Amino acid sequence: METFLFTSESVNEGHPDKLCDQISDAVLDACLEQDPDSKVACETCTKTNMVMVFGEITTKATVDYEKIVRDTCRSIGFISDDVGLDADKCKVLVNIEQQSPDIAQGVHGHFTKRPEDIGAGDQGHMFGYATDETPELMPLSHVLATKIGAKLTEVRKNGTCRWLRPDGKTQVTVEYYNDNGAMVPVRVHTVLISTQHDETVTNDEIARDLKEHVIKPIIPEKYLDDKTIFHLNPSGRFVIGGPHGDAGLTGRKIIIDTYGGWGAHGGGAFSGKDPTKVDRSGAYIVRQAAKSVVANGMARRALVQVSYAIGVPEPLSVFVDTYGTGLIPDKEILKIVKESFDFRPGMMTINLDLKRGGNGRFLKTAAYGHFGRDDPDFTWEVVKPLKWDKPQA
């Protein structure tokens, strides 16, 4: 059996870039909660002892940006300079302006257009991907890297590993077999964890705790063997982390947010953007489309692309590729996808209920992936029943 190796990485919520994603989405949540028609393009950057939020926001909501920044940093665990940032003492800079009137008239006609006539907020192309290799219909390499990152945070916050600090990165290499276009995981080849820690813990303690409390509960035993390689804090020391260690910026972890390098990516980030921004809503609808194709048994693996022009409601193109795993031709699957999903931005917003903020709805997406999550707020993960005629054997 000929196999190959594929690697996906993740970072957890204390990584500086992910901190910025979460702040941007916390701002979006606050705006949408009070004013569902808010137009939000919120960026965040951070470095030692400083967080800045900036961008274009048009909203009727009353938003305390500084409080959102401090609350988000605190909830992640940035509560002192020792761990990389002090939520209560750091400088918070805010530079927010209104959405450009040129964009506003072209996209939503200054709020006068009907939902079906609302244009895309920008040009761009987005991809959705699904694969039958996991129950989530997501790539195993990505799922494991993401879940290990989430577990790191869990054992830090619940006190299991008191030496842990907020910043951390994970990476998983999986050995795969290509079954006529479908991906079949064989084993986990390598697990890499680099996590921030306090000064008191030894490297041996770190390795022992990570294996016992993080790796063992997450990676199914069937994928591990005596040849699996573990790189646990291979640099030897990771005390300085968070924004003190590295600068952070919204939108720099777009592969971690999506499919871990599988499928494809149009380049647009998600966090801090309201649903008229097709970078986000377009990527959500094509995930639902790809997932529905696989879940309905039409293919074992699917990639769906959609593209837009600014101010134009109808997509410019829709594309489907099932990597040779489709039970019917891709052109027939494409026809079913176009009949079953409304790719107009205003209609995607309604059908996926994307104007609903609050409850940390978009904040939840900003760490540990936007796809493959079992949470009713992730409306794009709901499989749509598709009508198709299965070919007779």
From Swiss-Prot:
Co-factor(s): Mn(2+); Mg(2+); Co(2+); K(+)
InterPro entries: ADOMET_SYNTHASE_CS (IPR022631), S-AdoMet_synt_C (IPR022630), S-AdoMet_synt_central (IPR022629), S-AdoMet_synt_N (IPR022628), S-AdoMet_synthetase (IPR002133), S-AdoMet_synthetase_sfam (IPR022636)
Reactions accelerated catalytically: L-methionine + ATP + H2O = S-adenosyl-L-methionine + phosphate + diphosphate
Tissue specificity remark: Mostly expressed in flowers, seedpods and roots, and, to a lower extent, in stems and leaves.
Binding site for Mg(2+): 9
UniProt binding sites for L-methionine: 56, 99, 246, 277
Keyword Transferase (UniProt): yes
Gene Ontology CC annotation, any one: extracellular exosome
Metabolic or biological pathway, per its Swiss-Prot or TrEMBL entry: Amino-acid biosynthesis; S-adenosyl-L-methionine biosynthesis; S-adenosyl-L-methionine from L-methionine: step 1/1
Subcellular location: Cytoplasm
A UniProt-annotated Pfam family: S-AdoMet_synt_C
Example of a GO MF term: methionine adenosyltransferase activity
Entry binding sites for ATP: 15, 167-169, 235-238, 246, 252-253, 269, 273, 277
GO biological process terms held by the UniProt record: one-carbon metabolic process; S-adenosylmethionine biosynthetic process
Residue positions binding K(+): 43
Cofactor binding note: Binds 2 divalent ions per subunit. The metal ions interact primarily with the substrate. Can utilize magnesium, manganese or cobalt (in vitro).
EC number(s) on file: 2.5.1.6
Keyword set, alphabetical order: ATP-binding, Cobalt, Cytoplasm, Magnesium, Metal-binding, Nucleotide-binding, One-carbon metabolism, Potassium, Transferase
Record note on quaternary structure: Homotetramer.
NCBIfam families assigned to the protein according to its UniProt record, in alphabetical order: metK (TIGR01034)
Family matches, as HAMAP family: S_AdoMet_synth1
Similarity-based family: Belongs to the AdoMet synthase family.
Role of this protein: Catalyzes the formation of S-adenosylmethionine from methionine and ATP. The reaction comprises two steps that are both catalyzed by the same enzyme: formation of S-adenosylmethionine (AdoMet) and triphosphate, and subsequent hydrolysis of the triphosphate.
Protein name: S-adenosylmethionine synthase 5
